[in-house]
Amino acid sequence: MKKRLAMVLAVTLLATTVFVGCGSKDNSSDKNSKKEYTEKKSGDKFTVGFDQDFPPMGFVGDDGEYTGFDLELAQEVCKRQGWKYVAKPIAWDSKDAELKSGGIDCIWNGFTMDGREDKYTWSKPYLNNEQVFVVRKDSGIKSEKDLEGKVVDVQTDSSAQAALKEKADLSSTFGNLEVVADYNTGLMNLESGSADAVAMDTVVAAYQIEKRKADFTILDYEIAAEEYGVGFAKGNKAVRDQVESTLEEMAKDGTMAKISQKWFKKDITIIGK
């Protein structure tokens, strides 16, 4: 009798434990899936995630400070909102983890929207861009067809890499599609002759060619057309709306055009146009 009672009690205790454990797990899951985002207030910190090897959008200046077109836009937004601006360099292939953990508030660094529309909560696009090939002027490479059997460098986890994956009929003709850590490495490889071409953003390519005074040229071929936007964690419409409205204000009063003139010698922004 005592053995039977002990068995009944043991089974009852086990069932209760399993039930409670499952219930706790479900509640935790529900709690995590219902993350709420709120507007930032004056004095709050606003952390911008960026690739520090991506001039002119975001990079380390000669004075050792972080600078660039996108970072200047972010600074102006923070100034108008009364936020504390923080620029945080990140590994580009870790950007999603940084955003998900709350280590950064947004990704703002020549961030391509195309193909990622459902992955983030986006601002309106503020720049048009193309993915292109950069080659040496004396290479004899005149079109994308001349890249057959050649070494083409591309940054890891970049829009150019994704675009070339979509154009397998072209990339399959390359001798080697070499993935590098950043565009600076690719351009140095191009300069040394260890790479024949670099697939990259035309906005960045034009700036780099002028800055380096390099004998490079951009092929008249568009790998992909795209738009740049500011990417926030999925569902973070509150802060997105604050940033977006400030960018629209900056476009209206000419501040955005002024910053564009500084970096590109012309206004290439598209907000409010």
Model-derived regions, located:
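Short helix-initiation/N-cap motifs at beta->coil->alpha
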Residues: 71, 86-98, 177-192, 226
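Bilobed "Venus flytrap"/periplasmic-binding protein-like clamshell domains
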Residues: 52-55, 66-79, 111, 132-187, ...
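Immediate post-signal peptide segment of exported/extracytoplasmic ligand-binding proteins
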Residues: 26-66, 79, 140-151, 273
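Extended ligand-binding regions for polar small-molecule ligands
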Residues: 23, 71-80, 150-151, 156-159, ...
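Periplasmic-binding protein-like
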Residues: 52, 128-135, 202, 206, ...
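Ligand-binding clefts/hinges and TM-proximal coupling segments of bilobed small-molecule sensing domains
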Residues: 24-38, 42, 84, 159-178, ...
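Acidic, polar ligand-binding/catalytic clefts
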Residues: 75, 79, 84-146
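A ligand-binding cleft/hinge motif common to bilobed small-molecule-binding domains
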Residues: 94, 110-119, 163-168, 191-225
